């Protein structure tokens, strides 16, 4: 029986999953945390800098793969036919002429600018705004029209420009820049040199301004106008061709075959972003909105080319032919914070406990156990008394806003507090905020003529916290399907590996056998949905008002009258 392995590189850890190709049975899984990241190395949260050392990825991947393989029998290990890879994104890094990430070299070993710039790094806000302005110049080609019309600080070129401006040593040493989801398959197949490395359609189309209609990347003149420093240090074009993730980039290199005890015939599929492969693992069909929920969310919708036509959807994170399933248009949206908002509130409430633990070391374990119960206790308390009459209205922009209309200058806003607001009520407001953000994304599609036939949710929060999911269901006022697998992203990567290895002819055929099932379907509660509708309208009014306070200073005065009117309706 052929076995495929999926690798899912998340923000905190990497997951490896072995899947039987014929049945979709999940045979073994392993999760390995990134050791340097776990210690907070190379990050500066106050300044929105989040970097991953490449050794974190390499060491954790090897440990996860070896753990999974150790759980298989010798016969099963011999049946491994392919490895697929997904990752967060945009998470690019500078590489040298051999394709080594610069931080793997001694002189750059502790330089954060020589590492992978994690998706949620927002140090490049000004660079992103400059790219957006350049794309919208009258009379010129709008290279942002297939990525929603706004270039984000979370994306490829903004990060490259920021690091190139900030660090001349890295700029001089970098032969190219590579997305994590493209670099790992190249590492495993021994094809890391920039001229050998295959760039994925997913990362290139959604984050790098690549599109077939203008021949790939924007012309050199575009980057010269943005800032000549890019073309001074990097050869244009950085790349030309892209590949969908079902196409193998090669087979397992001799080095990695020896390290893992696998055959060199194991196919390595192309890479893609985690949420895109998660949608495939969830078995998504056209016009299903799939919410991959974790620290943030990524929302994926696929549509057939004929139904989309020449339409461009504004305010999303891109529409790319083949970024999810080959021959379909993949559309991406998302919330910059979801689980991270709940974790923030837990840290706020846990601060006194941390102080007590320092003062009373003997109570440390008991206090640690109490901290772990904070959020479950808050969830239960709000579920037992879910009053919506005095619910704080919160804007879920704690890490900026990804969709609709990316804006990483935005901050979280909490409104409608009074002296009776307690911790469960405020936590309920945070739950509602994440649900409101989810609805805003759904409406971004439907109001522009892209139908949403059903909504699916996957990930740990989706399966383990029905209170939060029911609130989302009520706010959306639609049935909400909860996907059974906890490991849909890794499962999706395994599905691509199976196709790359030739076990199946295409992704839909592999999905029929390997994709996860729906575990349960939640239904909206009419009374709650009606009350949430009123609160959602207030959320929208506050959004209009609050956003004006985070505009670049030159635009604030011009927008002021609109913000004052928003809350008088």
UniProtKB/Swiss-Prot annotation:
UniProt KW Nucleotide-binding keyword? yes
| InterPro entries, alphabetized | ATPase_NBD, FGGY_C, Ribulokinase
Task: Name the pathway it acts in.
Answer: Carbohydrate degradation; L-arabinose degradation via L-ribulose; D-xylulose 5-phosphate from L-arabinose (bacterial route): step 2/3
Cite a single GO BP annotation: L-arabinose catabolic process to xylulose 5-phosphate
Gene Ontology cellular-component terms listed: cytoplasm
The family database entries (Pfam families) matched by this protein are listed as: FGGY_C
Q: Which reaction does it catalyse?
A: D-ribulose + ATP = D-ribulose 5-phosphate + ADP + H(+); L-ribulose + ATP = L-ribulose 5-phosphate + ADP + H(+)
Q: What class of enzyme is it?
A: transferase
Q: Which domain of life is it from?
A: Bacteria
What does the similarity note say?
A: Belongs to the ribulokinase family.
Instruction: Please identify the protein, giving its name as recorded.
Output: Ribulokinase
Question: What species does this protein belong to?
Answer: Klebsiella pneumoniae (strain 342)
Which classification does the entry list for the species? Bacteria, Pseudomonadati, Pseudomonadota, Gammaproteobacteria, Enterobacterales
């Amino acid at each position: 029986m052929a076995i495929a392995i999926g690798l899912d590189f998340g923000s905190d850890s990497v997951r490896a999953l072995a899947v039987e190709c014929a049945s979709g049975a999940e045979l073994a899984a392993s999760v390995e945390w990134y050791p340097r990241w776990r210690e907070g190395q190379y990050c500066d949260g106050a300044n929105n800098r989040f970097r991953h050392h490449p050794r974190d990825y390499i060491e954790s991947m090897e440990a996860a793969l070896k753990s999974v393989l150790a759980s298989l029998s010798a016969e099963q290990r011999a049946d491994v036919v392919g490895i697929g890879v997904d990752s967060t994104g945009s998470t690019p890094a500078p590489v040298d002429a051999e394709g080594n990430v610069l931080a793997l070299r001694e002189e750059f070993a502790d330089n954060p600018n020589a590492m992978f710039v994690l998706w949620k790094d927002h140090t490049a806000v000004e660079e992103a705004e400059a790219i957006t302005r350049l794309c919208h110049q009258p009379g010129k080609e709008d290279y942002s029209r297939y990525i929603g019309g706004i270039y984000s600080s979370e994306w490829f070129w903004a990060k490259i420009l920021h690091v190139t401006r900030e660090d001349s040593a890295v700029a001089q040493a970098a032969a190219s820049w590579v997305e994590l989801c493209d670099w790992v398959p190249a590492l495993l197949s021994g094809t890391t040199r920039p001229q050998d490395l295959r760039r994925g359609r997913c990362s290139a189309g959604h984050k790098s301004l690549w599109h077939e209609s203008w021949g790939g990347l924007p012309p050199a003149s575009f980057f010269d106008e943005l800032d000549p420093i890019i073309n001074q240090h990097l050869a244009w074009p950085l790349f030309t061709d892209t590949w969908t993730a079902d196409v193998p980039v090669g087979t397992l290199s001799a080095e990695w075959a020896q390290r893992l005890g696998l055959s060199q015939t194991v196919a390595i599929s192309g890479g893609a972003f985690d949420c895109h492969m998660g949608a495939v693992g969830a078995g998504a069909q056209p016009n299903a909105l799939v919410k991959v929920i974790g620290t943030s969310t990524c929302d994926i919708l696929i549509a057939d080319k004929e139904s989309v036509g020449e339409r461009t959807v504004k305010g999303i994170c891109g529409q790319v032919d083949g970024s999810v399933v080959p021959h379909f248009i993949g559309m991406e949206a998302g919330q910059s914070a979801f689980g991270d908002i709940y974790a923030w509130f837990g840290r706020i409430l846990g601060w006194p406990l941390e102080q007590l633990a320092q003062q009373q070391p003997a109570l440390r374990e008991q206090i640690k156990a109490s901290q772990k119960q904070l959020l479950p206790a808050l969830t239960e308390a709000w579920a037992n008394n879910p009053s919506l009459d005095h619910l704080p209205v919160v804007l879920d922009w704690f890490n900026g806003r990804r969709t609709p209309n990316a804006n990483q200058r935005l901050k979280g806003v909490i409104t409608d507090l009074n002296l009776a607001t307690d911790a469960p009520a405020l936590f309920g407001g945070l739950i509602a905020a994440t649900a409101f953000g989810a609805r805003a994304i759904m409406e971004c599609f439907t109001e522009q003529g892209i139908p949403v036939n059903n909504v699916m949710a996957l990930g740990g929060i989706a399966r383990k916290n029905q209170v939060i999911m029911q609130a989302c269901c009520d706010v959306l006022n639609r049935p909400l399907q909860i996907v059974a697998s906890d490991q849909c992203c890794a499962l999706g990567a395994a599905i691509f590996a199976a196709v790359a290895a030739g076990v199946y002819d295409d992704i839909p055929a592999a999905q029929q056998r390997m994709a996860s099932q729906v575990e349960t379907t939640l239904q909206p509660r009419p009374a709650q949905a009606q009350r949430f509708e009123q609160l959602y309208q207030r959320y929208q009014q506050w959004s209009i008002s609050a956003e004006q306070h985070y505009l670049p200073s030159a635009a604030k005065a011009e927008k002021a009258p609109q913000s004052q009117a928003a809350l008088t309706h």
